[in-house]
Design a protein with these regions (language model features):
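Positively charged n-region of N-terminal signal peptides that target proteins for export
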Residues: 1-5
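Bacterial N-terminal signal peptides
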Residues: 8-19
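A short, gly/pro- and small-residue-rich
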Residues: 95-102
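Exported/periplasmic ABC-transporter solute-binding proteins
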Residues: 20-61, 66-76, 85-86, 90-95, ...
Length: 287
């Protein structure tokens, strides 16, 4: 778990941030970010703010956390890895693609059911997703963090028959968190297993049905770290500091991300935080 001592020092780090990057931006400095789509709306706002304040050009690749990690590895470039959960950050650290000492926790996430606004199918809980006639989507658990969380929840709570019925109801394995939200927002499915914050990405078309506390295995968090492919570690670290600034934290707050473990626990109950989950082979081979 990342020490909160860093957060206490973030104000000082951000204080020197703008002076340092003014010089760098004059030389045409750029940053390339590989970002899990679990933070897409607030990250887009934060990037624009960073560019406006510093003049530094920031390019962002959004997608499923596993997929963008693969892209970063194949490209052998990138300054920041900013996945949607700890699962893929642990892999990136283990395989040497980020500097472990630069990892910080940005916000926390809780899995939930997301349905069309008004809940026309009257979905009340997890078991309803296995009922006949319900169209469901989950993110692809092979490369999208929220898909792995969905599988973890199904494996914990469903009987063999319920799991079989649930799989029959799946009409789409989406490629990112953003696309998971889109399929329910466009009424292509009745429900998804996503994040509680999805409702606040698009409140006009989506609402959240909380899972029961005992159905949720763990609370997730969104980490950020400097990539070992970076050519400008100093600037990359300054971007990390900026993301942890109060100004950016307030942007995440507007979208109802949880800023602490305690906030997440107040919503769902106390749970293990972070970690990794090995998706069973039956979910990754032919599904």
């Amino acid at each position: 778990m990342v020490s909160r001592l860093f957060l206490a020092g973030a104000v000082f780090s951000v204080a020197i941030f703008f002076v340092a990057t003014e010089v760098l931006s004059e030389n045409g400095e750029r940053l390339l970010l590989f970002v899990g789509a679990a933070s897409k709306p607030p990250t887009e706002e934060a990037v624009k703010l960073f560019e406006k304040k510093t003049g530094v050009r920031v390019e962002v690749v959004f997608g499923g956390s596993g997929y963008i990690l693969s892209q970063m590895i194949l490209a052998k470039k990138g300054d920041i890895y900013f996945p949607g959960s700890s699962d893929y950050m642990e892999k990136a650290k283990r395989e040497g693609y980020v500097y472990p000492e630069t990892e910080r926790i940005v916000v926390y996430l809780v899995p939930a059911i997301n349905v069309q606004k008004g809940n026309p199918k009257h979905i009340k809980g997890l078991e309803d997703l296995a009922h006949p006639g319900i169209k469901v989507a989950i993110a692809n658990p092979e490369g999208v963090c929220v898909g792995a969380y969905a599988v973890e929840i199904i494996e914990k709570n469903f009987t063999k028959k319920q799991k079989k019925d649930f799989k029959k109801n799946i009409v789409n394995y989406t490629e990112s968190c953003a696309k998971t939200l889109t399929v329910v927002s466009l009424k292509q499915v009745d429900a998804v297993i996503g994040w509680s914050v999805f409702q606040h990405w698009n409140p006009e078309t989506v609402e959240t049905i909380p899972l029961k506390s005992d159905e949720v295995v763990r609370v997730g968090y969104i980490p950020i770290a400097v990539s070992t492919f970076t050519k400008n570690k100093v600037l990359a670290e300054q971007f990390v500091d900026f993301i942890l600034s109060e100004e950016v934290r307030s942007i995440f707050k507007e979208y109802q991300y949880f800023s602490s473990e305690q906030e997440a626990f107040a919503w769902i109950g106390q749970k293990p935080v972070g970690g990794e989950y090995a998706v069973p082979a039956e979910w990754t081979t032919g599904k």
